[in-house]
Amino acid sequence: SREGMEISRKTSPIYQNWLDINLEHINEAAESIKEKDMGKLGKVTEENCKFMHEVMETSIPSIVYMTGITNSCLDIVKDLKARGHELFYTIDAGPQVKIICNSNSSQIIKDEILSKTKIKEIIHTKVGGPPSLINEN
């Protein structure tokens, strides 16, 4: 992914636009966390994720991480949002979708993805505790 981002930095015509908007996205995300506004956090997270993938796709050579299954997962997220579930996604340099949701939606998300895609396993995690120092070196 470092190599891919270096290719994007050098060749994508929209790389600088993505950098320019990143500080705005970071500030919006920080504000939404302070406000405990999951919808607002989801909107900016998804927007930044999509922009990053557009940067990679417009690189030479084009870098495409998303697969058909990735897109199927995004369709499921959209459908669940339309049905009133509070969730959003992000995807880093790879095809794996990370879905952030309230705990009351996690099982239906898992059920929908497993029944509608070829995904065999979902890793379910929870928010950890506060930051702590584990090694001073």
What are these regions (language model features)?
Residues 1-137:
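C-terminal nucleotide
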